[in-house]
Regions:
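Acidic/His/Gly-enriched intrinsically disordered linker/tail segments
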Residues: 271-342, 351-352
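Bacterial N-terminal signal peptides that target proteins for export
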Residues: 1-10
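Bacterial N-terminal signal peptides
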Residues: 9-17
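Pan-zinc metallopeptidase signature
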Residues: 325-403
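Juxtacatalytic substrate-recognition/specificity segment
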Residues: 165-276
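Beta/coil-rich, acidic/histidine-enriched accessory regions frequently appended to metallopeptidases
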Residues: 23-42, 46-51, 371-541
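Sec/Tat signal peptide C-region and signal peptidase I cleavage site
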Residues: 18-22
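Zn2+-dependent metallopeptidase catalytic core
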Residues: 57, 61-66, 72-73, 82-97, ...
């Protein structure tokens, strides 16, 4: 059939929007200096609004720091709005501030750690392509020069190390030159040891070694650590000394082993579970904890102390709520996925029914996930393939309406792996801090802000507070030192009951009196694990 010119014109007009919407969106992430990236978005015609995949408050706060370099487009809420058919360019300052997810422009001497999720766009205008530009690029286990295109399937979820000059090292790992040789050696030892142990114990796992990016950084306070476990495994060491003490060595071992343990899990596959954060972070903690004992990085007594501390703080920080009643913000703000997750894994797997080691049960759960199955989490860990088996630890902990404290008090006597014990002074100090926070919440319309110091605690003054109008540095409470005194907690309780107020002695010689209607509940007992029995149960065939 012969098609007339009129029909050709109409057909072309009808196809224009389709072709426009199938055009490619190109995102270039370029290292332009030690303290900035230039990120550009090449937008096709008719593409006037594209959604950022990192949305809501965290994503918007990240984009608020971007500096427009032209008038092509601007972030508005969760959208990149544009007239279309132009390339929007933004200067993105380097920052160590963690806002939401992986950092987008984390500085390191000579370059920057970058993660494309901070610049990822929806594909509503067509496929989105991501490219890194720098003299030296490490991405997906390879080194590139000048330019590297991220894989199409994972482009919006790809980390990279961008360097200002070509690198000559045969290793892809990056170690900040400010870190001591001893620190670098410890990172390598713990990384290699974790990989060796878990590769043997989890034979069904598909492990690929990530590139290490160990970066020194600074923040208020003392030495601390942070990181994440993407294909470039970022380890951030804050205020790190050249000569490590026992505390720094312990923190570093925990960080490195935890992050490498994550590489034997599947982060995205557990997102279908309501307890995804606990499954992922608690699982990483469990692997780290057991590996550290078996590799000799933790003595049995140290492992017991870590487990007992995590459980005690899980009970304290759930604040009389059930796990289901806690909001994601409450869980994340108190790190409850770690604190509650570690003992949940340890005790549930130690009390498992049927044959096989705890790690074999763990391995089988993740193998099922890799095959596309969604096994019941509690059933998979506690029962496996054991017939007529009913899990006895995880369901009450994670699904009951009773408080976490009540559920632990029910579960632990049944499995006979821990016994009550009086609180240590460290736990008494934790309870004093929680009592101070409760006073602030009641006085300040639900808000609180405190900073611990060697001499006491700083209470942040806020306009919404009835009594705490300015920052107050408290060095005593009811005549007792804030921390380190077994009598401080009971004195707070007695003052609240007798006078309905609690008195703070201030560093400047003044006094702060805060109303108190209901005293904080000071616990008189926590749990001590039977470490020998528990480890024997975890390792039994």
């Amino acid at each position: 059939m012969k098609i007339s010119p009129v029909w050709l014109h109409l057909l072309g007009a009808a196809l224009l929007p389709l072709s426009a919407h199938s055009a490619t969106v190109n995102v270039d992430i370029k290292l332009i200096s030690a303290d900035a990236l230039e990120v550009s978005f090449a937008l096709p015609e008719h593409c006037t609004a594209l959604a950022f995949l990192k949305d809501e408050r965290g994503g918007q706060e990240i984009r608020a720091a971007w500096q427009k370099q032209n008038d092509c487009a601007a972030p508005e809420g969760n959208l990149l709005k544009s007239a279309g058919a132009c390339t929007a360019r933004f200067r993105v300052p380097a920052t160590m501030q963690k806002i939401s997810g992986y950092p987008g422009s984390f500085p390191a001497p000579g370059g920057m750690y970058v993660h494309s999720s901070n610049y990822a766009l929806a594909d509503s205008c067509g496929p989105v392509r991501y490219r890194y530009l720098a003299p030296d690029i490490v991405m997906d286990g390879q080194r590139y020069h000048d330019s590297a295109s991220a894989p199409a399937a994972t482009g919006g979820d790809t980390p990279a190390m961008l360097m200002l000059a070509p690198q000559t090292s045969t290793s892809l790992d990056y170690f900040d030159p400010r870190l001591s040789a001893a620190t670098v050696a410890q990172i390598r030892e713990v990384a290699d040891g974790t990989i060796a142990y878990l590769s043997k114990q989890l034979p069904l796992a598909r492990f690929t070694r990530p590139v290490i990016a160990a970066i020194a950084a600074s923040e208020p306070g003392g030495p601390n650590v942070g990181g994440d476990a993407s294909n470039i495994l970022r380890l951030t060491l804050f205020n790190w000394p050249q000569v490590q003490g026992p505390d720094e060595k312990s923190k570093l071992t925990v960080l490195v082993s935890h992050e490498f343990s994550h590489r034997f899990q599947l982060r995205d596959a557990v997102d279908v579970y309501p307890d995804a954060r606990l499954i992922n972070e608690g699982g990483g903690e469990f692997l780290r904890w057991l590996t550290s004992v078996q590799q000799g990085w933790l003595t049995r007594q140290e492992a017991a102390a870590q487990l007992d501390k995590a459980l005690a703080e899980c009970i304290l920080y759930t604040e009389g709520k059930s796990w289901r009643a806690l909001t994601p913000r409450e869980i994340g703000g108190q790190r409850l996925e770690y604190l509650c997750g570690l003992p949940a894994y340890v005790y549930s797997l130690a009390a498992r029914q049927g044959p096989g080691t705890a790690l074999a049960r763990f391995d089988r759960f993740y193998h099922q996930l890799r095959q596309g199955q969604v096994p019941d989490f509690a059933q998979a860990l506690e029962c496996g393939d054991t017939p007529a088996c009913k899990p006895q630890v995880l369901p009450p902990l994670l699904t009951s309406t009773a408080t976490m404290e009540q559920q632990w008090n029910e579960v632990l006597p049944k499995i006979a792996l821990a016994t009550p014990r009086p609180p240590s002074q460290s736990l008494r100090d934790r309870m004093v801090l929680r009592a101070v926070v409760k006073l602030m919440v009641d006085d300040c319309a639900g808000r609180s802000g405190t900073t611990e110091t060697p001499e006491g605690i700083i209470l942040d003054g806020m306009t919404v507070c009835k009594s705490i109008h300015k920052d107050s540095y408290a060095t005593s409470i009811e005549g007792h030192p804030v921390f380190g005194d077994a009598a401080t907690g009971p004195a707070m309780t007695n003052a609240c009951l007798a006078r309905h107020e609690v008195a703070f002695g201030l560093k400047d010689g003044g006094k702060l009196v805060v109303p108190c209607q209901t005293p904080y509940q000071m616990r008189t007992a926590f749990y001590a694990i039977d470490i020998d029995k528990t480890l024997s149960q975890l390792l039994r065939e």
